[in-house]
Structures are given as C-alpha cells and as structure tokens.
Amino acid sequence: MAKELISALCDMSENVVLCSQQYHSSEIGSIECQSSIEIPLIRESGEFYILVAKMSIRMKDIARDLGLSVVTISKVLRNHPDISDETRERVLARVKELNYQPNIAARSLVTGRTYLVGLVVPDLLHPFFAEIAKSLSEALRKSGYYLIVSSSEEDPDMEEQEINQLLGRRLDILIIASCRSTVDLFFRMERQKTPYVLIDRILPGLTANFIGVDDEAVGRLATKHLIDVGCRRVAHIRGPETSTGIRRLEGYKHALAQSKLRFADTYVITEDQGDIESKQRGAEAMRRLLSLRPRPDGVFCFNDPLAMGAINQALDAGVRIPEDIAIIGCGNLHYDDSLRVPLSSIDQHSWEIGQEAARIALGILNAKTPPKPETVILKPELVVRLSTQRRRTKQMG
C-alpha cells in the first residue's frame, strides 16, 4: 500500500522523488537529504519509506545565504560589470557549491524571452565560421543566452528554410552570414519585428547591423604582398558571388592597377561551389592555372582551404612553393603552420567578429527601444609565412 501511495504522489508532481533506500526505524536519525523537505514517514511491514520533495535552489535562497540582494545575484550570473570581484567570487562559489541552475522556463515566463540566439552560417565545418560560433557562444553564455547553430550549405533556399525553422522556436534574435543576393527575406523579418544581425557578408540596399572585415582591403593587402615579394603575374582563385567574393576581387584589381600590372581574365578562376569541399576546388583551380602560358607566379586565394588545395596540387605537379609560385590565403586558420608549406594569410579576426556580434545582439535585446543599426568594419592583418617568403630578385616590369 505504501509503495502504491508513494508512486501516486510521485506521478502527481515532477518535483517529488523517492529516496533510493528503504530505512528501518533505527536508521532514521542519520538521514539527510540536501535541498529537500522530508515528508512524514510511511510505514509498512516494519520498514519506513521517506518521501522527499525536491526544492529547487532559487536566487533568493543564495541571496539570503550570502546576505545579498537578489538583484546582486542576478547581476553576477549575467556577468554584469557593476559587481566587485570579491562579491562575484562569493556568489560563484556558492552557486557552484549548491549546483544552482537557472530556471530558464520560469525566467521565460516572466520576461517573454527564450534566451536562445540563432546563428546561420554557410558552412558549419569551415574553421572561420566555427571560430565565430565558438566566440559568439562564449560571449552569450556569460549573459545567460544560449546559441543554436545551423548551416545553409551556401544554398539560399536552405538558408530561408533554416531561418524559418529557427524562428519557429521563438528565438530572441538571429545572427546570419547570408549566402543570398536578394533582401526580400530580411525585409519580411523586419516587418515581423524579428531582430537580426548580419556578419561577414552584407547585402546591398539593406540597412542592418553588420560586423565583418573590410573585404576590399583584404584583396588589396593580399595582392600587394604578392607584388612586393616579386610576383608580376598574380592570379586569383575567387569566392562566391557574395559581398566577400565581389569585394576581394575588387581589391585584387585595385592592387594590380596601383602597381601598373595588367589584369587578365584568364588569371581569375571561379570554381563552382557545388558539393565539393574547398580544398578540392582549390586543387582544380590550381590545375587550370598551371596549364596557362605564361604561368602565374603568384596566387591570391579567397580563403585558406582553397589555398591549401592549391598548394597541394602545385607541389604534386613538381612546382616549388614559394620559389616558382607564391600563394596566400585568407582566414589565418589555426592549422596553417602544420601544412606541407606554412601558408601566408590575411587574418579576418573571426574571434572578434563573434564577440562584436554578441555585443550588438545583447544591446538590441536589452534596449527599451530598437537602437539604430550599427556597422563594425574590422581591419584585415597580413600574416606572412613560408608560402610567400621569396627573395626580391625579380626585375620590375
């Protein structure tokens, strides 16, 4: 009878659990259940069953224990700067001791928020976007928000589908690296009062919050570096028809013009995105460049994976890097030093993009009225490694 009663009580509330042991009367005095209330014992056949109602640790419990206000506890948990280091350490120590977990559901009922942020990127496996996601997640977590990441696979239709799926989960805000060439989807989101932030890629005609690198400067910086190390026939393995690909191509052309070098269409290789990974596309592009006469002596690649494929193809064909062809990528990915030839690259500051995106997103969510759209353009940085370290022995012209 006792077991049936306990089972019924447990079924009535998710906050009621049964201690795992059965206790005899001689053992009752030593029983302790942390964060719980002991309900009167039920006796059956000389055995005692203890029904325990779990009590969720609340912020006000921590505040009472430490002699602080609930507001102070909340600020610590949201990583608010207006808290002393001593108070922060006391609160975090107590939170860890009690294994306190914020009740997101209850919080959502009060605030009307889900505390979820969506991120849509073209390629989850690309290290550039992976680092942005990691940076963004870390920054959001400090303020009690959590990140859901999705991939569009460089497909505008899939991007719209993924965005709609995320919006169906009532996310508080979206952060998007779009592969679209039209703005209709974003105009619709604005009409629906759905806040969003664009990263890496911007769309013409759209006034929106944006964080990214100066892509025209990326193209100029990479191409000028190749020219500075003696290259006179500089090719470009270009990227997709997005703002990043278009502007890096413009920077490439500008650098050639500034150095009075001729631009040749045959030296610009556009590889179909398809389902082929970037390294394979880079290898195929380099195969085409090696068949040209005169052959390029320098190659600026849209990103590091393309450059990695290009280097491998050139080396396999017996071409020396950098003596015969100097190659530079973009992204400054962490594994560049472990390549067959360490790759020179342009740092796009992916970690900073994630941090800035989080800052702007949180600013939107915490503002009483929608703030004016903010644009953050980061300055690219040249990182020189072996793939472009050539002696300047070539004659000008």
Question: Which residues fall in each region the model found?
Answer:
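N-terminal helix-turn-helix/winged-helix DNA-binding helices
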Residues: 50-58, 96-134, 142-145, 153-155, ...
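Short histidine/acidic/glycine/proline-rich micro-motifs that form metal-
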Residues: 123-126, 153-154, 180, 239-243, ...
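Bacterial carbohydrate/catabolite-sensing allosteric modules
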Residues: 5-8, 16-54, 97, 135-143, ...
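Short hydrophobic/charged patches on amphipathic alpha-helices used for structural packing
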Residues: 106, 160-163, 186, 223, ...
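N-terminal helix-turn-helix DNA-binding module of bacterial transcription factors
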Residues: 14-20, 27-115, 392
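Short beta-strand segments enriched in small/hydrophobic residues
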Residues: 65, 70-75, 109-125, 225, ...
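Central regulatory/effector-binding core of bacterial HTH transcription factors
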Residues: 138-184
